[in-house]
Amino acid sequence: KIIKKAKETMEIYAPLADRMGMNRIRDELEDLSFSVLNKPARELILNRLKFIKNNNEDTFKTIAAELIKLLEANGIFASITGREKTPFSIWRKIQNKKISLEQLTDIIGFRVLVNNVEDCYKALGLFHSKFPAIPGKFKDYISTPKINKYKSIHTSIIGPKKNRIEIQIRTHEMNEFAQRGIASHWKYKSSEKFSDLSWKEYDWLRDLVEIIETGNSPEHYYEFTKLQMFQENVFCF
């Protein structure tokens, strides 16, 4: 029964959280399910991540300080944090890309938060002018957001000491949405940033609620939810 629930969570509830932009909840649901469906793999990845964190703390601090210095010298005030991948996201990439755990976890990840969209692109230009960019790793989700309205700039560079560095650049508001998804809109309900037009993007969610309230069998809800979730897109992470 536990395995059945874990599979259901992985197939329905985690993707549903993703579709609503609730990345933090999605990650928690995936991790809980992963701990049931493949506990040995999860433990292996967690041990690898712990090893990397313990042995690269000084490197993280040095690189973060250098990036901050570069931005501040050009009038951009930002906060930079390390970005840790979740065990399941690492496992999924290992399976999809057929690469080793060591190859994937050797990459250092940072999240750069700035005050406005203009600074996002300025920061990107500074990073690319200072460090070699890795071809094929640039994605602009600000000009072209994901279907769940996620916005951010992703790029990868060869940083100091020849480290491969993945960088996400976004505003504070974009970061809040990336974590809380549709719920972050409620914060702006009484402000100019919020409008009824925002909710038209989530008409599919209203349909889903109606299906649940009709009291159909769990099997009907399960199948309908899958159809509603994936009828337009195939999600890549």
How should each PLM-predicted stretch be described?
Residues 1-237:
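Nucleic-acid processing machinery
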